[in-house]
Amino acid sequence: MKITNITIEVIEREIPDTGLDSDLGRFSGVTEQGLLRINTDAGIEGHCFVGEFRRGGRSLFNPILNVLKPELMGRDPADREWLWNRLGVLSSRRGITNNMWAPVDVALWDLAGKAANAPIYKLLGAQKYSTEVYATYPPRHETAEGFVKEASELMNSGFRSYCLLYTSDAADE
């Protein structure tokens, strides 16, 4: 199987005002994200969204299409480790960062799962068949107090677990 094309379909969408306030502003407004598609000669297509739900992904589209796409065209999509090994060069010489590479990696794993007709977690060797739901958000606070308040609100909503995402300033506290 070989990669025949890589495209990004730009999706502009309105984020409704949910009333979630944060130190970083309110979560609402228009954002652009991309739907990354990696096509193969076998007719299998891998997908991944590009960009954060609030900040969008416009800044990631060109590096993916102009730097990573030429590296992948004609290659076997199972050669994920080959591209990981190229990241050092692509990072230092071409400015590729992990947030540019990550959607491509996810789409390649999506392809692998579809080609094997198996969920990705099984390809990775997982044996757990269920997991408890947890809450997570992009960083919404810059102070420890903000995170404590958010954790309390989530706990009162019934969540028992919370994936804490923070900025370096909040980590210092």
What do these predicted regions represent?
Residues 126-132:
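Short, conserved phosphate-binding/catalytic loop or strand-edge motifs used
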Residues 148-160:
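Alpha/beta enzyme core
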Residues 1-42, 47, 53:
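Structured beta-strand/loop patches that form or line metal/cofactor-binding pockets in enzymes
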Residues 132-146:
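Active-site mouth loops of central-metabolism enzymes
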